[in-house]
A protein has these predicted regions:
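Short, acidic, small-residue-rich periplasmic hinge/interaction motif at the N-terminus
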Residues: 17-60, 99
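N-terminal periplasmic accessory domains that precede
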Residues: 34, 67-70, 90-93, 105, ...
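Extracytoplasmic beta-strand/coil segments of soluble accessory domains associated
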Residues: 68-110
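Short acidic/polar hinge/loop motifs at secondary-structure boundaries
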Residues: 110-138, 157, 263
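Flexible, solvent-exposed coil segments and beta strand-coil junctions
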Residues: 158-166, 195-204, 264-275
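Transmembrane beta-barrel wall of Gram-negative outer-membrane proteins
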Residues: 166-168, 172-204, 209-246, 282-285, ...
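Outer-membrane beta-barrel translocator/channel fold
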Residues: 235-271, 275
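Conserved small/polar residues in nucleotide/adenosyl-binding loops
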Residues: 315-321
Length: 322
């Protein structure tokens, strides 16, 4: 079991351009976003290549596949899927840089693994359903995480507070017995400024590759408090993946004759004859995240923001060779 605690404290100043016409009086209205990620986001005049993706654009493709697969149509992006169906273990490369050089942040907090700096999207199934918007920066970007963002940056912002209450039930069915069920709700913003929302998801798939099955569960719970000067956002989210291992690959001869062959779990007798496959050659992994964001507007030109993050990881493996 592994625990990771992150503290992020920032203070941002907004310069106000003086008007040449001093006879004109303008009333400035400043609206704070649900979570301030301005330090990580590129603007129109920022000298870098980037793409902004809205919630509406994500929803058009969000039928159960992992987030990297939803971004596969963006320039310079190549995605992979161990199971071949876009569900389970997936990866992303941007301009040739692998996932260890693609910095991922959720509400401004780094999501990449602290040791390998890889990103395991399988541990956040259906997370796209709780993303309000994202920005992909190609090449060295604005990330505050230094060299980790050498190849690219993916900045995710989770759902904003919904003004109206709602309840949603969504299901999708696809090839290879792929099935996704999602339940979402929101209480709407109350008169006192509070809002609570959540999501439960379940995704299952047999995969294109032999025995590359996935059984994924996820949750997302969020509470917000909004006033003119104060924004508080507390959320917890996580996932549980049970996936049959399918990352070993095959030689060119096997690929030509049987593209879907999966050598994981092979069992041989004393003479070297293949007897079958181990049924429980799976990854059993849980990942939970808790975030707290507080933002206080000090004046029209300054605001103070605080971010806290707690991560809990639990991995269980019962592979045949262990």
């Amino acid at each position: 079991m592994k625990y990771i605690i992150t503290l992020m404290l920032g203070c941002s100043l907004m310069a106000q351009q003086a008007k040449s016409d001093i006879d004109t009086l303008t009333v400035n209205t400043v609206t704070l976003e649900s979570v301030t990620v301005s330090a990580l986001r590129a603007k129109e005049n920022t000298p870098m290549a980037f793409t902004n993706i809205s919630k509406e654009e994500l929803e058009k493709q969000n039928l159960g596949k992992d987030l990297p697969v939803l971004l596969r149509f963006l320039p310079n992006v190549v995605t992979t899927s161990d199971a071949g169906a876009g569900v389970g273990y997936t990866g992303i490369r941007v301009r040739g840089s692998d996932a260890t050089r693609v910095n991922v942040t959720i509400n401004g907090i780094a999501y990449n693994d602290a040791e390998s700096h890889n990103t395991f999207w399988v541990d956040l199934p259906d997370f796209a359903s709780s993303v309000d918007n994202l920005q992909l920066q190609r090449g060295v970007g604005t990330s505050t995480n230094g060299a980790a963002a050498f190849g690219a940056s993916i900045n995710l912002e989770t759902d904003k507070a919904s003004e109206k209450s709602y309840a949603q039930l969504a299901s999708s069915v696809g090839s290879f017995s792929t099935l996704k069920n999602t339940i979402k709700f929101s209480t709407g913003i109350s008169e006192s400024g509070f809002e609570f929302s959540g999501r439960l998801s379940n995704i299952s798939s047999d995969g294109y590759v032999d025995r590359a099955s996935s059984n994924l569960k996820a949750y997302f719970l969020q509470g917000t408090y909004n006033t003119n000067n104060t924004k508080i956002k507390a959320l917890t989210f996580g996932g549980h993946e049970l996936t049959y291992q399918a990352w070993y690959g095959v030689d060119p001869a096997t690929l030509a004759s049987k593209r879907t062959y999966n050598p994981a779990g092979e069992q041989y007798d004393e003479d070297g004859n293949l007897q079958g496959y181990y049924d429980n050659q799976v990854d059993n992994y849980k990942q939970d995240h808790t975030q707290l964001h507080i933002e206080q507007r000090l004046s029209n030109n300054a605001r103070l923001s605080l971010g806290l993050n707690y991560t809990c990881l639990l991995y269980t493996s019962d592979a045949a060779d262990e």
